[in-house]
C-alpha cells in the first residue's frame, strides 16, 4: 500500500491511497456492507454513486456464510461482485458489544448471535479470516471498551489492544493487503496518547481512531480525536471508525482525519430521512404529499433525476420497499458527492467555507425534519 498527501489546508489533507484493487482518494467515506452487502444496494448502484471503497465485517462473515464459502469464491470481492477496494473490520467492536463468556489476553469467548453457540476469536484467528477474505485493508483485533467503562477498565483495554496489535502484526503474513492499527483510550487523553505511541512504535500501514462516537458528548469526540492525531505519523492515513454524519465528518477532516465509515446514511434512509445540501429531509412528513420537487435539486443521482418527493412520500406511506431503496441510493450518492466537494475545497482553499455551511445546516437539525 502507498499513501501520498497531495495538498493540505490547515490540518485537512487531500491524499490518495494506492491499494491492491485500485486507488482511493481521501478524505473518503466508506459505505458499510456488513454482510457483504450494502443494504438495499447492488454493486452497480455503488459504482454509479462513485464509491471507491466499501467496508465489510470479519465478525459477521466468519459466522455466516463462513470463511470456507468465501474461499470457494476465491475471496470476498468475487463473492459479492465488487471489483474496487474493501476494508474489513476485525470484529473487535462487534465482539465487545455482545455478552462475553470469557475475555483474557488469549482472546474472547462469546455466544454467536445467530445460534447461541460458543465462538472463540483472537488476533491470530481475525488475521487468518481477513487474509482469506482478501480485503485490501485489514484491521488489527482490538479491545474496544464499553461506553460506560471507568478509567481502570479503559486502561486495561488499552494495554490489551497493544498486546493484541503486536500479535496481529506477527500473524499478518501477506503481500497484497494492508494492516491498520487501532488506537483506543476512551475519553482519557493520557490513555489516547499512550495507545497512539504504542501503536506507532509497532508500525502499521495506517491508523484508526477507535472507541469514539459511541455516546459521548460531541466535544469529547473532537477533543479525543485531536489528542490522538497529534501522535500519529503525517505519512499514514488516519481512519475514524464509525463517524458518518456530514457535520461530524467535516469537523474531523478539519482535524486531520482521512477516512470514515458509518451505517448512518443507509439506516436513516430506510426510516424515510434524506441527506441534502440544506440538511436532513423527512420524506414521511405530510408536507411532501404534493411536492413535485426532487429530494435535492443539487443532486444528480437516479432518485433525484427521476422521482418527486411526493412519490417517495407515497411509497413510505404505503410501506413499499422501493421508497427505502430510492432514499438509500440518494443518501449514498450524497455522501460520495459531499466527499468530492471536501476534496475540491481542500484543493482550492475553500474548505473553511464548505465546513461552515455543512456544520450550520446539520447542527441546526436541517430543514423539514
UniProtKB/Swiss-Prot annotation:
Question: What keywords are annotated for this sequence in UniProt?
Answer: Glycosyltransferase, Metal-binding, Queuosine biosynthesis, Transferase, tRNA processing, Zinc
| UniProt-listed SUPFAM superfamilies | tRNA-guanine transglycosylase
Identify the catalytic residues. Answer: 89, 261
The record lists Zn(2+) as bound by: 299, 301, 304, 330
Instruction: Report whether Zinc shows up as a keyword of the record.
Output: yes
- Which leading EC class covers this enzyme? transferase
Q: Where is this region: RNA binding?
A: 242-248, 266-270
- One short Pfam name that applies is TGT
EC number, UniProt record: 2.4.2.29
Function summary: Catalyzes the base-exchange of a guanine (G) residue with the queuine precursor 7-aminomethyl-7-deazaguanine (PreQ1) at position 34 (anticodon wobble position) in tRNAs with GU(N) anticodons (tRNA-Asp, -Asn, -His and -Tyr). Catalysis occurs through a double-displacement mechanism. The nucleophile active site attacks the C1' of nucleotide 34 to detach the guanine base from the RNA, forming a covalent enzyme-RNA intermediate. The proton acceptor active site deprotonates the incoming PreQ1, allowing a nucleophilic attack on the C1' of the ribose to form the product.
Q: Quaternary structure per UniProt?
A: Homodimer. Within each dimer, one monomer is responsible for RNA recognition and catalysis, while the other monomer binds to the replacement base PreQ1.
Q: What is this protein called?
A: Queuine tRNA-ribosyltransferase
Q: Which organism is it from?
A: Thermotoga maritima (strain ATCC 43589 / DSM 3109 / JCM 10099 / NBRC 100826 / MSB8)
Amino acid at each position: 500500500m502507498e499513501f501520498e498527501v497531495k495538498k493540505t489546508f490547515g490540518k485537512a489533507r487531500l491524499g490518495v491511497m494506492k491499494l491492491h484493487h485500485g486507488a482511493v482518494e481521501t478524505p473518503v467515506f466508506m459505505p458499510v456492507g456488513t454482510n457483504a452487502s450494502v443494504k438495499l444496494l447492488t454493486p452497480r448502484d455503488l459504482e454509479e454513486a462513485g464509491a471507491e471503497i466499501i467496508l465489510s465485517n470479519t465478525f459477521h462473515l466468519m459466522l455466516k456464510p463462513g470463511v470456507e464459502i468465501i474461499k470457494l469464491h476465491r475471496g470476498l470481492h468475487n463473492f459479492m461482485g465488487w471489483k474496487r477496494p474493501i476494508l474489513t473490520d476485525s470484529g473487535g467492536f462487534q465482539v465487545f458489544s455482545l455478552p462475553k463468556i470469557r475475555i483474557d489476553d488469549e482472546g474472547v469467548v462469546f455466544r454467536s448471535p445467530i445460534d447461541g453457540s460458543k465462538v472463540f476469536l483472537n488476533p491470530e484467528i481475525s488475521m487468518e479470516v481477513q487474509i482469506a477474505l482478501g480485503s485490501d485493508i485489514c484491521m488489527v483485533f482490538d479491545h474496544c471498551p464499553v461506553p460506560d467503562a471507568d478509567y481502570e477498565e479503559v486502561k486495561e483495554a488499552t494495554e490489551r489492544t497493544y498486546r493484541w496489535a503486536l500479535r496481529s502484526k506477527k500473524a499478518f503474513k501477506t503481500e497484497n493487503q494492508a494492516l491498520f492499527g487501532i488506537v483506543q483510550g476512551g475519553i482519557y487523553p493520557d490513555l489516547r496518547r499512550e495507545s497512539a505511541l504504542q501503536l506507532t512504535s509497532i508500525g502499521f500501514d495506517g491508523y484508526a481512531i477507535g472507541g469514539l462516537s459511541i455516546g459521548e458528548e460531541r466535544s469529547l469526540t473532537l477533543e479525543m480525536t485531536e489528542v490522538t492525531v497529534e501522535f500519529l505519523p503525517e505519512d499514514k492515513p488516519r481512519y475514524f471508525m464509525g463517524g458518518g454524519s456530514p457535520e461530524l465528518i467535516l469537523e474531523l477532516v478539519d482535524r486531520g482525519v482521512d477516512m470514515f465509515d458509518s451505517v448512518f446514511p443507509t439506516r436513516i434512509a430506510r426510516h424515510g430521512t434524506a441527506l441534502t445540501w440544506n440538511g436532513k429531509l423527512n420524506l414521511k412528513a405530510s408536507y411532501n404529499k404534493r411536492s413535485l420537487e426532487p429530494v435535492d435539486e443539487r443532486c444528480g443521482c437516479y432518485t433525484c433525476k427521476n422521482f418527486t418527493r411526493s412519490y417517495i412520500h407515497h411509497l413510505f406511506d404505503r410501506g413499499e420497499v422501493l421508497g427505502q431503496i430510492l432514499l438509500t441510493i440518494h443518501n449514498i450518492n450524497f455522501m460520495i458527492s459531499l466527499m468530492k466537494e471536501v476534496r475540491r475545497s481542500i484543493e482550492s482553499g475553500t474548505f473553511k467555507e464548505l465546513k461552515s455551511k455543512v456544520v450550520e445546516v446539520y447542527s441546526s437539525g436541517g430543514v423539514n425534519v
